Amino acid sequence: MTRTVYVNGDYLPETEAKVSIFDRGFLMADGVYEVTSVLDGKLIDFDGHAIRLERSLGELDMRNPITKEDLLEVHRELVRVNEINEGLIYLQITRGSDGDRDFAFPDPETTTPTIVMFTQNKPGMADSPASQKGAKVISIEDIRWGRRDIKTVQLLYPSMGKMMA
């Protein structure tokens, strides 16, 4: 079964999903993300994720392209059409693209943010060995930048840390 994803207002088969190569999220990690767990087909702490999303967007002076109510509806629809009982929904909003690569932020009045959402099915997530017994972790200095409170898509260093563990 092909997974259904959400891109800029449209529900699409994942094989048809496209984002511009000039999108600032791709070129500059200029975006934020949230991951909402799904257990027993229910969203876990959606309100907390929506609040943090709004705060992160505000800290980056990014426009939110979707209302909280519509965001909840998209989450529920993705859970329904993808038949997710245990898993997650990944959401990413980027500043979008106004054409060529540039360090200056594009005009928010003329540039539409990009929003992408997809599900991951994780059957047995709550009963996994890591959930039951824990997982090996290490502590490493976070050298990303001084604004770790903003949940950006800059995840290379945490990925490297996971590989070190």
Q: What kind of region is each of these model predictions?
A:
Residues 1-165:
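Conserved alpha/beta cores of soluble small-molecule-handling proteins
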